[in-house]
């Protein structure tokens, strides 16, 4: 065929790669179903060009001296994978698979694992598309003839079943180089998350511009990955909010919304919602968000918040608070050691932290030096609880009155309620005594014994009234 170079639209050459690229470029224009004659001529031109290239000195074809040309199905498959516009389209893959219907059973058996090998060696492969070919050729059901390593095949089929990290169709409008770079980034992202999560923060810390495809599965994964690393991704704040609104029963949705709002640095406008979330969905994750927000915006609340979290966790099987000395849990001490080095923590907060961490030793800064601090009443009650002392009515009444103050913040209200519960629980436990043994009736002579009884009755009335006020607040 003397006009093979004209059909391939290239100059005469002995470079097989140039001939093959020219053939692959023209192949989509001559489909065997829509233009069988054109496809036949193109195929003949390709084979003739290969013969000439492999033996340019000979004008007569001698087939025994040349390699057998690759099957047109394999060439069509390579062309599909190389197509910038069709490689991720299921419809294009369906058209390719229809070509297999023209092959005999013997040809299908020969092509089955060759096609699988080509797919396995393709860097950017849509599993949504290749699963169509896997089902048609029964890669999972048919016995491997040994052409492919069994473990590699099993791993490949598992990856197909798992699916891509996102739908590659969403980036087909981008330049090919950007498509490939985006796929590489997110595939590596998913690999690190599943195999080496400790490297996640380091990987995300790399400064680079990355496309975020419009894919809900990817968006949710990104929210999970970034939140796990305590990193912000402001581009997905709107999606996180819409996720919570569309799936109100999904407990993950509000967490990722509030997590991103915290890590993006939202301040006072978030506090009320965050406190409500902490009450409605108690968890260590919610605790971490509250602590992170405090450390960013109201660091002096941090020690009190740590104590509040500890008190909420220490309950019995009936959910009733246990009597304990604050600061003994390892988690509490860890959080307090973290905040001790924070320069923004006031002397008042630092003194309470040192008191909790170094029991039996006097803190370097006296708690009484900051009586003008707005949180002084709360810290005073917290100090008494840390020292295992019964809070006095004089120390409790100021924080009770703060609950009705117009300028108190939601976090302050949470802390006050928890301090009052601890104080009430402390009072109840203190009044529990062993069963008394029979004793001779004391003689009421108006002396110190009578005065002691009067004092006991007085304190019982005081604390009974205080407990009544607390119950009224929570009723």
From Swiss-Prot:
The J domain covers 3-70
Q: Which PROSITE patterns match?
A: DNAJ_2 (PS50076)
Against SUPFAM superfamilies, the record matches this protein to: Chaperone J-domain
Signal sequence, renumbered to the chain? none
- Would I find Cell cycle among this entry's keywords? no
Q: Which InterPro entries match?
A: DnaJ_domain, J_dom_sf
Record key words, sorted: Chaperone
SMART domains assigned to the protein according to its UniProt record, in alphabetical order: DnaJ
| CDD domains in alphabetical order | DnaJ
Q: Does the keyword Transport apply?
A: no
Its name, as the record gives it, is: Uncharacterized J domain-containing protein DjlB
Gene that encodes it = djlB
